[in-house]
Amino acid sequence: MADVAARLGISKMTVSRALSRTDRRSRSTSEALRQRILRTCHEMGYVIDQTARTFSSKQSGIVAALIPALNNSNFSDTAHGLSAALEARGLHVLLGYTDYDLATEERLIRAMLSRRPEAIVVTGGHHTPGARTLLRAAGIPVVETWDMLAEPVEHTVGFSNAEAVGALVRALHGKGYRNIAFLGGVPES
């Protein structure tokens, strides 16, 4: 930041104010000066220190998300959709991969929360007691996905596999089918 300020002959504080301004209505610097600062930052390859910004603003601009598998198109599609929706709102996803392991999920929740995310999205509703404690104490929005939970930590976005299969079996039974089987994969242990 000091190099940008020196090149433009302005104070570091002016550069800081221009870079931290996220709203056009905020006029701590003129728009013309802000554009000069942004151009100079781009020319010099200056990258904003998000750690410092998080410290001063108390906003990280990230949403933590934990998924069980990267090689499952359902979860990779979820991560892609979440990323696209958040990006449109100026937020970024910090993605963790649990490999269907609850102890790994708890470790990742602790690690993600240490980054001070704006929210955390976890897959499923089965968590260790320690993970549930961390999520409840986080002080940020918690979203559990892919299940309809009787006792969610906070928010749930999902569906009930049991209800969906029940509806399917009832429909098939209603059409006269009696020998019904289900074949499905299970995560490797």
For each predicted feature, which ranges?
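N-terminal helix-turn-helix DNA-binding module of bacterial transcription factors
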Residues: M1-K58
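Secondary-structure junction motif
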Residues: F182-S189
